[in-house]
Amino acid sequence: LRPEIYGNIADEKVELNGLLYVIERLPIGIEECRFINLTSEEGYAKSHFKANVPPKRRRNCYRIDEDQMNVVITRGRSDIYDILTHLTFIFIESHKIKNRVLLDEAGEVSHDWKKLEIAVQQNKKLTQVEKEKAISHTANILGRTFEEILDIYDAFGSATTPDRFLHVIYWLGKLAIEEMVENNKRTITFSPVLRERLGHHIHGEIWATNIKEVLKENNLLGRPIHVISANMHSVMNSIFAVPALKTKFKNQSDFFIYEELSKSGANEVRDLVEAIALKQGMISLPDTSGTNIDVQIFDTAKIDWSKTSFPKAQLGEEKPVLIVMDYAFGEQAYETIDELFKPYKKETFLNAQSISIMGKAGILEGGKGDIMIPNAHINEGTADNYFFENELTADMFEGNDIAVFAGPMVTVLGTSLQNRDLLQFFHESTWRAI
């Protein structure tokens, strides 16, 4: 397979964008670790070990010592596929680095490698001159131009570790060289408890029970329930943001206001909208179960609809309850919905009326930001799929200056395994996937 995300994985030169994508989804320091141990939730949160959460994937990881990283798996097999494909990628890239710098089996290395090692071992922020010298040597090692490396250099860094790019390249290469010269193999293990618990819905059950208990405490269990899978700000903003911020953003469109709220420094306006929502029946449930899925519950009876974006909303006799859940991860979507719809304490059935899923997906027809309406599903092979009829149709979304496509949807086991040729086949063959 040549997964699309990983770019030039099959070429001799090191793939930079793919490496950035993967490094952002793995814990900081993993490039230094020879032993990766996948565990379930086994009590590390109660220890002196500090949780190390990757910037782009919410999963707890713990650096046990200089050689070992533990990664906590709470989201089922999709999480394991995700991690294994990312680790496979960095291992492949590390061997490319090794092949370019190792001159013989005795461990003699190239001049460029020695210079990179000196730069990394300084353990201080490099001056502009030192940085550019190190980039020049690294460009030779990676088979890339000076400019290509300069362009991506800062994306790897942070305020505390601006030169992390060099550090990542050095340690990937170093471990691959030691594998070759000293036969110190990198090892991925699964803890016995993780093997035992996989597929048992442990975290999903705790998560769902917690939601049902909050519904019961607030006398909402018997009301009609609509489940919405979306970002935590989406539903809250669509109901409360525009009226709340109309005076601040005079004569601006609704979409302008939503964009302002999404900006990274917009905490003040976001807090304002959230404060209004909390006063009008929103209950916020940050996750404590290990699923990493936060939840908001909206009691529509407590909302003053005249002061919302939907002043003409007609709610009927029994005012419904909205349960907004953050995006699930792969197989976890089945686990959480399966557990949520189980009766509370065996005798109280939930009055579930609808599930709405706002999701991101790769589009085969059209472009980024277009709307896709799946009308059939081609599944990637595990039995854990929850089937339902899609009541949305393309014509409901026409006329908003956004392109809309309807057709079959292909699901793949882990984002990281999307392959252009395979997807092209599904798009162009009789499957006609979008």
Which residues fall in each region the model found?
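Short N-terminal helix-initiation segments at or just after the protein's N-terminus
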Residues: 157-173, 262-263, 289-304
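Adenosine ribonucleotide-centric catalytic and binding domains
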Residues: 224-226, 230-293, 371-384
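Short, hydrophobic/proline-enriched secondary-structure or compact coil segments at domain edges
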Residues: 223-231, 321-328
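Short, basic and Ser/Thr-rich N-terminal targeting/leader segments
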Residues: 221-223, 351
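Ser/Thr-centered flexible coil motifs
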Residues: 127, 142-145, 160
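N-terminal glycine-/serine-/threonine-rich phosphate-binding loop
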Residues: 175-221, 330-333, 343
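Long non-globular sequence segments
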Residues: 148-164, 171, 177-184, 189
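Glycine-rich phosphate- or other oxyanion-binding loops that anchor nucleotides, phosphorylated ligands
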Residues: 1-139, 197-205, 294-434
